[in-house]
Design a protein with these regions (language model features):
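N-terminal cap/lid subdomain of alpha/beta-hydrolase-fold enzymes
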Residues: 53-54, 58-145, 152, 183-186
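Secondary-structure transition/capping motifs at alpha-helix termini
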Residues: 157-158, 187
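Catalytic-loop region of hydrolases
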Residues: 2-74
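Alpha/beta-hydrolase fold nucleophile elbow
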Residues: 159-172
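Glycine-rich nucleophile elbow surrounding the catalytic serine of serine-hydrolase chemistry
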Residues: 83-85, 169-182
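Non-catalytic N-terminal regions of enzymes
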Residues: 17-20, 24-32, 119, 149-154, ...
Length: 187
């Protein structure tokens, strides 16, 4: 278990800004990726500008897809919980790599990145690598405000505003997603 956690932390922290992660995998873990991986933070500042709030994401470029192709869907993955980091689902369920308990990587032939650009978002703020220096998120309404702000900033920054968008998840994400969709439609 400790190797799983260590491997997860190394993989996630190794690309904390939008960077091609291939050199890291080649040099550090001996694994050769056939696609690009990115990660970073989006500032959340629409509704709470006085707080230092950041939402963490990892972006897995669709296998064989051009990052600039507007026809490639954006697939958002939200873990359940509440309080479970989406990076867990990324490395154990829907992402392109599995991390085994011994720390070894295995390619996931059924990854959702085979169908589009996969984005795993740690939410609500305070979960995983997302953080808030103000008051904690305590309800779905506030989580919806943060997610709407995140998604607007993320899609704008990556120039994905015209791409098809799918928001998916498991467990408690089924509670969040309808609320997020309502906020997105209103904003």
């Amino acid at each position: 278990m400790k190797y799983l956690l260590l491997g997860f932390a190394v993989l996630t922290l190794s690309f904390c800004l939008p960077v091609d992660a291939t050199p890291f995998f080649n040099s550090k873990l001996g694994y050769n990726l056939s696609y690009k991986a990115y990660s970073g933070y989006e500032k959340i500042d629409w509704y709470f500008p006085e707080q230092t709030t950041r939402m963490y994401y990892s972006l897995w470029q669709g296998v064989g897809d051009d990052i600039k192709d507007k026809s490639v869907p954006i697939i958002i993955w939200l873990q359940g919980g509440p309080g479970a980091a989406s990076q867990f689902g990324c490395f154990n369920e829907v992402g392109p790599l599995y991390i085994h308990p011994d720390g070894k990587l295995q390619e996931n032939g059924y990854s959702w990145s085979n169908r589009g650009h996969l984005v795993c978002v740690d939410q609500p703020v305070g979960v995983g690598f997302s953080y808030n220096r103000g008051k904690p998120v305590t309800d779905t309404y506030e989580a919806s405000l943060h997610f709407t702000n995140f998604l607007h900033n993320f899609l704008s920054e990556w120039n994905f505003l015209e791409n098809p968008l799918y928001i998916s998840g498991e467990s408690y994400a089924g509670h969040y997603i309808p609320s997020f969709a309502r906020f997105l439609m209103a904003n």
